[in-house]
Amino acid sequence: MSISHIFGPQQPQYSSVTASAHGKVNLHLGVGPAREDGYHELDTIFQAVSLKEEVTVALRDARGAQDAEAVQVAEAAQEAADAAPCTWSVSGFDSHLVPQDSSNLAWKAVAAIQKLARQAHVPWADAPVHIHIDKGIPVAGGMAGGSADAAAALVAATELYFPDSRASRRPDGAQLSDIAAELGADVPFCLLGGTARGTGKGENLMPVIATGTYHWAIATDKRGLSTPEVFKQLDQQRAAASAASPKAARAGSPEGLIAALRTGNPEEVGKLLVNDLQAPAISLLPSLRETLKAAEEAGAIAAIVSGSGPTVAMLCASADDAVEVATAVSVAGKASSTMTTSSPAAAAGVIKREEVLE
């Protein structure tokens, strides 16, 4: 039976939708003291990079037989999230490291949109779905790969369940941003893309004007770092350094960086890259110091631990320079893998729709 005969008079317009969302680098990451809820106050400048994730959400009856590697989400998790039956599969960079359980942010994002679709009486809201993630961003590397999965899944699921952009029940940008913030602190920026200043946990965003294109060499480390552990190490380092309360943002104000971004001059931007989490990340993974040194020796304008690490982002003068720096760091044995990318990049968006066949 074709999918067009399953749902009665109101049929889905699409059998599957694919969306993409980009990773990020933190050009400035100032970390304040821990809050009562356990999070830290942040003052950060995000910039989206060309590395991206692609997420496809498909109505499973439209997809036919499932891939042999497809993983079934546990029924208990589906019931707890009030979600439709779901399978998923993963391909691409570090695909074997992607969590294949209910902690997966892409699945949580789809479940959130399914809930809205159910409230709006969308007939296919409870239909089984398949989620496929094609990864292009390092896993657990401080570049928001999981958050990009969630952002892309939000966009794809919204288009699948609410194909009419004029429909009153379709979640708008503000509502998607609210859902994104519930999923994770970096997810709202992965929806927005471009360049933005983030405060609070990073979810309160203000777009920043940036001109020019910035070229990066990226060095990954397969050992990974736990974000909570890096923040814990920062707190311990600060407590050991001073009995006084830590300042709200040890990296200082990002206003100088914001001004430099308007010029489009990578040399000026490079002078102002700063990350309060770099020292604790190096403390937990001392080899990062050698990676940063190798980047400098290879001719990078500047190098910085990306977010909570362990990925190192190396700002370069040109795309050719980025290739040379990435190659040099790799040959020196100071990274598990290297790649190049550029910034800024666009917002999350739909890249493919498959119409339902009659």
UniProtKB/Swiss-Prot annotation:
Active site, per annotation: K24, D186
Residue sites binding ATP per the record: P138, V139, A140, G141, G142, M143, A144, G145, G146, S147, A148
EC number(s) for this protein? 2.7.1.148
SUPFAM superfamilies on file = GHMP Kinase, C-terminal domain, Ribosomal protein S5 domain 2-like
How is this protein named in the record? 4-diphosphocytidyl-2-C-methyl-D-erythritol kinase
Sorted alphabetically, the keyword list is: ATP-binding, Isoprene biosynthesis, Kinase, Nucleotide-binding, Transferase
The EC category is transferase
Function (record text) = Catalyzes the phosphorylation of the position 2 hydroxy group of 4-diphosphocytidyl-2C-methyl-D-erythritol.
Q: Does the keyword Kinase apply?
A: yes
Reactions catalysed, semicolon-separated, are: 4-CDP-2-C-methyl-D-erythritol + ATP = 4-CDP-2-C-methyl-D-erythritol 2-phosphate + ADP + H(+)
Q: What does the record give under GO molecular function?
A: 4-(cytidine 5'-diphospho)-2-C-methyl-D-erythritol kinase activity; ATP binding
Listed PANTHER family: 4-DIPHOSPHOCYTIDYL-2-C-METHYL-D-ERYTHRITOL KINASE, CHLOROPLASTIC
**UniProt pathway:** Isoprenoid biosynthesis; isopentenyl diphosphate biosynthesis via DXP pathway; isopentenyl diphosphate from 1-deoxy-D-xylulose 5-phosphate: step 3/6
Judging by the UniProt lineage, the source's domain of life is Bacteria
The record's family statement is: Belongs to the GHMP kinase family. IspE subfamily.
Q: Any signal peptide, and if so, which residues?
A: none
HAMAP family per the record?
Answer: IspE
**GO biological process annotations for this chain's record?**
isopentenyl diphosphate biosynthetic process, methylerythritol 4-phosphate pathway; terpenoid biosynthetic process
